[in-house]
């Protein structure tokens, strides 16, 4: 299992648009991908509803975890998408 920690910079946090983009990217990979909220609640990154239900806000420190055969590639791709869309 691999994980990274990032800080959310988007003024409105993870809302519908970034959740859709993140989930779309995550679904390209076989690995299990989880986002862990500051309170420790885990959500499936491949689910838009799971991502939005975590209530991630600006300046929240979140952890992204990946476990599987393509975990490193998946983490790098998710981080790149978050950076490209200025979520982190």
Curated annotation (Swiss-Prot):
One of its GO terms (cellular component) is cytoplasm. It is found in: Cytoplasm. Keywords: Cytoplasm, Phosphoprotein, Phosphotransferase system, Sugar transport, Transcription, Transcription regulation, Transport. Phosphorylation on Ser-47 inhibits the phosphoryl transfer from enzyme I to HPr. GO terms for biological process: phosphoenolpyruvate-dependent sugar phosphotransferase system. Pfam families: PTS-HPr (PF00381). Residues 1-88 form the HPr domain. Coiled coil: none annotated. Its main location: cytoplasm. CDD domains: PTS-HPr_like. Transmembrane segments: none annotated. The modification Phosphoserine is found at residue 47. The keyword Endoplasmic reticulum does not apply. The keyword Cytoplasm applies. The active site is at residue 15. Belongs to the HPr family. General (non sugar-specific) component of the phosphoenolpyruvate-dependent sugar phosphotransferase system (sugar PTS). This major carbohydrate active-transport system catalyzes the phosphorylation of incoming sugar substrates concomitantly with their translocation across the cell membrane. The phosphoryl group from phosphoenolpyruvate (PEP) is transferred to the phosphoryl carrier protein HPr by enzyme I. Phospho-HPr then transfers it to the PTS EIIA domain. This is Phosphocarrier protein HPr. It comes from Mycoplasma pneumoniae (strain ATCC 29342 / M129 / Subtype 1) (Mycoplasmoides pneumoniae). The gene is ptsH.
């Amino acid at each position: 299992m691999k994980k990274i920690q990032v800080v959310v910079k988007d003024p409105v946090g993870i809302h519908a648009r970034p959740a859709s983009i993140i989930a779309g990217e995550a679904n390209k990979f076989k690995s299990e991908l989880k986002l862990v909220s500051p309170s420790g609640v885990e959500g499936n990154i491949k689910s838009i509803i799971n991502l939005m239900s975590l209530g991630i806000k600006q300046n929240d420190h979140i952890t992204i975890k990946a476990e599987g055969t393509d975990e490193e590639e998946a983490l790098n791709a998710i981080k790149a998408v978050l950076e490209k869309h200025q979520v982190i």
